[in-house]
Structure formats: structure tokens, C-alpha cells
A protein has these predicted regions:
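Bacterial Sec-dependent N-terminal signal peptides
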Residues: 1-22
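Short, conserved micro-motifs composed of acidic
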Residues: 20-299
């Protein structure tokens, strides 16, 4: 069964920091076990805000996440560990003069990617940007992916070891998302290509999260075996480069309403789930059980 292979998937995240040792203390919070519990109240999960997209540096000394009253009015928040103490959450410097959301580290921690409407007349028209880590600071923001179609917005970047960026292209007229990828070659990103995740059912795919080695892709999608609205799915990559049909994560993560995709801690131990305008977390072994129940024995 393919669900068994997911163990290797989660374990790969413990190695994705290229030899760096994760020392993230999870803010001293008690392990949630297999329950979905609120993560870091008043630190990450803030009152009167909608939080999403928790990004932890590969060595665990920096945390970014998006917060705001509601999209598109979002800012990326920043917390850093200095002298064994965490700073108070503050707006990241590159987010001060614009709206930003959905940060994600490159596997080596050298870059932070995110979505922003910086420089756009329509504040909803997000593109993919990144900042580079220079010493202990972050450099000037640089736009790296822009499809240049005013009705298409680029969201939720996720990065592989080779530098390929997976992201969502949202059609603002049709209200439908599709996953695209753009490879890094000769110092620039190639023309984005659509990632085909389904073959028999039309639907919408958003919020990708890719394995650093591109073996698996987690998305929030509609259509196939949905409990209602958007559900969280995982797709496995075949040897020929195509993707198997998505598998639903089941009742533990999906409801009759819309359910966002989730992120995984750099050590592979925890899932971060976004619901009810806050961040929740749970051990990954709960996801393994859920996947086994929903795996397709015919695949």
C-alpha cells in the first residue's frame, strides 16, 4: 500500500536541512500526540487574526507565518531566537510596505519564498518573491515568478532541493486553482508548467506542499472523494515523472467544509494544520493511520 511509503516521506524532512541539526524547541509546548491541538497560543495563534503557513528554519532559530484580519490584507510575521529566548512576533521587514503571505524556506535555509502584491495596483494580485539570507540578516526582496496575467494570482510557494518552486495559480475569474512548477536554471526560473494531478475528474487544486526530493505532493483540492468543499490530499510521483491520483487524508483532517493543506516540521515529527483562523498541530503518525484507511489498494 502506498500509505506505508509515507513513512519515508516524513522521515526525509529530518534530513532536508543538508546536515544542519534542528534545534527548534516548539516554544516549550507539550507534545499534542495524535490530537489536533492549538499551536503556540498568543505566540503564533494570535487573537483576532487569521494565521497560516508556518515556516520554521531548518535549524530552528527563526519562524515566519502569515497573519491578518483576512485575505488579501495579510502580513508575514517574524520570530527569532536570540540568547535562548524568542522575540515577540513582529512584521517582517520585507512585509512592512505591502501585503505578503504564505512564507516557505528553501530546504537549505538560504532563501525564504513568499507571495506578495508588492508594486501591484490590485492588492489581490499576488506574485512569488524571495529574500536571501545574508549573514544574520535577510536581503532585499526579489520577484522571481510572475505569470503577468492580471486575472491569475500566484500563491503558496514550496521548494525542492533542486530549487524547483511548486505553487498555486489562482484564476480570479473562474475561482479555480491549479498547481504549477517552475525550475531554477542558469540563475533564473523557467516558464511555469502545469502539474497534472487528476485525469478523470475536473476540480481545483491549491496550497501545495512538496517533498524536497519531489516524491510526494500535498494539496488542498476539490472533486475526487471530497468530504465537502476543499479537502487535503497527497499525490505520489511515478518514475516517469507523472503523478498518481490524489489520496484523501480522511476524517481526521477533512470536514464537510473547506480544509486547507498543511505544512510539516523540518524534523518530520509534526503536521501544522490551518483551520478556524488558527494554527493547529499533531504528530505525523496520526496522518499515517488516516492515510492507511483511505489508501486505494488498486493503485
Amino acid at each position: 500500500m502506498k500509505a506505508v511509503a509515507i513513512i519515508t516521506f516524513f522521515m526525509s524532512f529530518a534530513l532536508m536541512s543538508n546536515g544542519q541539526s534542528l534545534q527548534f524547541d516548539y516554544f516549550g509546548i507539550k507534545n499534542p500526540g495524535e490530537k489536533n491541538e492549538l499551536f503556540a497560543p498568543n505566540v503564533v495563534s494570535l487573537k483576532n487574526f487569521n494565521e497560516k503557513s508556518l515556516a520554521i528554519s531548518p535549524i530552528g532559530d527563526e519562524v515566519f507565518f502569515s497573519a491578518g484580519p483576512g485575505w488579501p490584507e495579510c502580513k508575514i510575521m517574524y520570530i527569532k531566537k536570540i540568547n535562548n529566548k524568542w522575540t515577540e512576533p513582529k512584521v517582517a521587514e520585507f512585509s512592512i510596505d505591502c501585503f505578503t503571505t504564505e512564507p516557505a524556506f528553501s530546504p537549505d535555509g538560504k532563501y525564504l519564498y513568499y507571495s506578495s502584491s508588492k508594486g501591484m495596483q490590485d492588492i489581490k494580485q499576488y506574485c512569488i518573491w524571495r529574500v536571501e539570507k545574508i549573514g544574520n540578516n535577510w536581503g532585499a526582496p526579489k520577484k522571481v515568478i510572475d505569470i503577468a496575467d492580471p486575472k491569475i494570482w500566484e500563491f503558496h510557494p514550496t521548494i525542492t532541493k533542486s530549487g524547483t518552486v511548486y505553487f498555486c495559480c489562482w484564476d480570479s475569474l473562474k475561482q479555480v486553482g491549479n498547481i504549477y512548477q517552475s525550475k531554477y536554471s542558469d540563475g533564473a526560473y523557467t516558464e511555469p508548467e502545469k502539474v497534472v494531478l487528476r485525469f478523470d475528474i475536473q476540480g481545483s487544486d491549491t496550497d501545495p506542499f512538496v517533498d524536497p526530493d519531489e516524491k510526494y505532493l500535498i494539496t488542498s483540492s476539490t472533486g475526487q472523494n471530497s468530504k465537502g468543499g476543499y479537502d487535503t490530499y497527497i499525490s505520489y510521483k511515478k518514475e516517469d515523472g507523472s503523478w498518481l491520483s490524489p489520496i484523501n487524508f480522511g476524517d481526521k483532517f477533512n470536514t464537510i467544509g473547506d480544509d486547507n493543506s498543511f505544512d510539516i516540521s523540518p524534523d518530520g515529527r509534526f503536521l501544522f494544520i490551518y483551520k478556524q483562523d488558527d494554527v493547529y498541530w499533531t504528530e505525523t503518525k496520526g496522518a499515517l493511520k488516516s492515510l492507511r484507511k483511505n489508501d486505494d489498494p488498486n493503485e
